[in-house]
From Swiss-Prot:
Family matches, as HAMAP family: PyrG (MF_01227)
Annotated catalysed reactions: UTP + L-glutamine + ATP + H2O = CTP + L-glutamate + ADP + phosphate + 2 H(+); L-glutamine + H2O = L-glutamate + NH4(+); UTP + NH4(+) + ATP = CTP + ADP + phosphate + 2 H(+)
Binding site for Mg(2+): D76, E146
Residues holding UTP: S18, K193, T194, K195, P196, T197, Q198, K229
Pathway connected to this protein: Pyrimidine metabolism; CTP biosynthesis via de novo pathway; CTP from UDP: step 2/2
Stretches with biased composition (Basic and acidic residues): 584-594
Pfam families attached to this UniProt entry: CTP_synth_N, GATase
Protein name in the entry: CTP synthase
Binding site for CTP: S18, D153, I154, E155, K193, T194, K195, P196, T197, Q198, K229
Gene: pyrG
Entry's EC annotation: 6.3.4.2
Amino acid sequence: MARPKNVKYVFVTGGVVSSLGKGILSASLGMLLKSRGLRVAIQKYDPYINVDPGTMSPYQHGEVYVTDDGAETDLDLGHYERFLNESTSQASNLTMGRVYKSVIDKERRGAYLGGTVQVVPHVIDEIKDRLAELAKNGNYDVIITEIGGTIGDIESLPFLEAMRQMKLDMGDRNLLNIHLTFVPYIRAASELKTKPTQHSVKMLLETGIQPDILVCRSEKPLSSEIKRKVGHFCNVNNLDVIGLNDCDTIYEVPLTLLQEQLDLRVLKKLGLKKFKEPDLVYWREFCNKVKHPTSGEVTIVVCGKYTEYPDAYKSILEAFIHAGASNDVKVHVRLIGAEAAENEAYDFARELEGVHGILVAPGFGDRGIEGKVAFIRYAREQGIPFFGICLGMQCASVEFARNVCNLAEANSTEFNKRARYPVIDLMEQQKKVKEKGGTMRLGSYPCIIKEGTKANEVYGKFLINERHRHRFEFNNAYRETFEEHGMVFSGTSPNGELVEIIEIKDHPWFVAVQFHPELKSRVQAVHPLFHGFVGAAKSYAAVGHQPELAAIEPHFMPEPTAEAYAAYSEESSAESKSFFPDNGGHDEERDSGQ
């Protein structure tokens, strides 16, 4: 493995239990190093055999995070983007399935010259080569790699072996391991217990890896005595035992780690001396707004299909935190399963009392669709601010067709292939697609916004780029009928063929989009649609009439370049060729609970 000069590597592992927050830790460290002037790349290694999480159920994996270049990735990449305010890519997520697939493909091509293909060296070398490629293709000072899973899992062993070999080759000054562990608080004894951490480090040592820094998650702050004890039994300097007790919000984690001097310990161990003091004024102000808003609170319902597992809507929930801060309000989110509203006895007035906005979330498959349509109808008829995303836009189109355009049998061909009025239909270029994984319309595409619309008002521009993940689209055969009944098609593809945004003008806020705006909302760049929607809910809570949008800084959505616009404008009318040629996807099989 040829390593570019001067690139330093940080690997983040986890022990004791899963879900300790390795992604938040990695993102926080990346943000702190970036704030000191370093160029940081961050990536996630997942040990599962799936090529990507695109075909995995939301109940098992949570949200699938889509990047600009059309990669379907782990939700931790969302944390990376939100904390670092930088876009990730296909290179930012590597699964063991992708590694094995690459090795097997090479073997079939005869790349190993008749040799016996083994985990060592071939699989390990593939992992190391992927990391070297990332370093070579970017101008980075530090590359942070989060290894998914928990120490002791058999699936993670190849990644750990690759890290061990790299550290042996590069030396301690070029690669370090941060191990995240759990120090439980036993209430009966009023004590923090370090034994689980000791055993976790012992298991890591069995792989040949001595952790350089320990970050200890705990309910209570770690005393200096506890840190000395952990350091003594884990063969780590007590200065390298970092306490990370529970925070009120994940956005306080970087501030806690800064206070614990994690970034300084990393810089010292890697021999990085040229850096500046971090400027975290904006970050502190943001956390203060999240914890102590001064303009009241709003309650927003998220109607979805996977509401038992909030991680399925991770980016939506985080976008509401950003939009709450930008509107100086506390946003309370209530997750409601769409199937509940399919019961004729469902009392919307009682169940939605005190609700100031309704968001109908993305999803796949026909389960709960009629419930989503019912929620949309209630929001439209009662003048409650409404926001639909992806499937939410498609359901809004079905509802409008049935109850406003008098097309009672309107539906999407995803749910009824013989629908009398197929207002939502499979995209033309998808009709010959047979494979599920890696075949949807994925990644960033442009959208032209119509002047004088709500979309134009919140974006403050006419050309935007947004991320997509879908196969079905609005059927243009019904555009004229919809417009005659008051629907505004406020955003389309540059060639005008694909509907991207719809809205109703005589409504406080009724906006639905085919793309996924939640994937581009960040701490330092709140998404304008979420900002506008929460602003509408805030006004609805106060006076119940047409909202006045709160002011927002104009820097949050970078303008596409003229070259990008020209490239998109030259697409065919069917838009069959993606700007990113390696896009992929899948659909309804993820809804394992249909």
